[in-house]
Amino acid sequence: KYAEALGVQKDELLLSQPDTGEQGLEIADALVQSGAVDIIVVDSVAALVPRAEIEGEMGDSHVGLQARLMSQALRKLAGTLNRTGTIAIFINQIREKIGVMFGN
């Protein structure tokens, strides 16, 4: 009801909750390439967990996987976004380390 009150046309809204970051970014890429959407919002980048991390064991080190995933996806999406005129918004979250002051 809140979305409707804001003017969101729910029948035209596409919502996806993929299992992995790769899957989510592939869905985003396919939608942009199709030209069927004018704007795409990814909320949140922090929730785009790489497949290797999901399939791995607890405690395994996956240094830089998410950064590589996003870097590759953005390189791939940039041209398509430009060509189709689609707007992409990526929402992330700020995480703080306990006991660390700003700038440290």
UniProtKB/Swiss-Prot annotation:
Pfam families: RecA. SUPFAM superfamilies: P-loop containing nucleoside triphosphate hydrolases. GO terms for cellular component: cytosol. InterPro entries: DNA_recomb/repair_RecA, P-loop_NTPase, RecA-like_N, RecA_ATP-bd. This is Protein RecA. Keywords: ATP-binding, Cytoplasm, DNA damage, DNA recombination, DNA repair, DNA-binding, Nucleotide-binding, SOS response. Disulfide bonds: none annotated. It is found in: Cytoplasm. The lineage of its organism: Bacteria, Bacillati, Bacillota, Bacilli, Lactobacillales. Can catalyze the hydrolysis of ATP in the presence of single-stranded DNA, the ATP-dependent uptake of single-stranded DNA by duplex DNA, and the ATP-dependent hybridization of homologous single-stranded DNAs. It interacts with LexA causing its activation and leading to its autocatalytic cleavage. The gene is recA. Its main location: cytoplasm. GO terms for molecular function: ATP binding; ATP-dependent DNA damage sensor activity; single-stranded DNA binding. Belongs to the RecA family. It comes from Leuconostoc mesenteroides. One of its GO terms (biological process) is DNA repair.
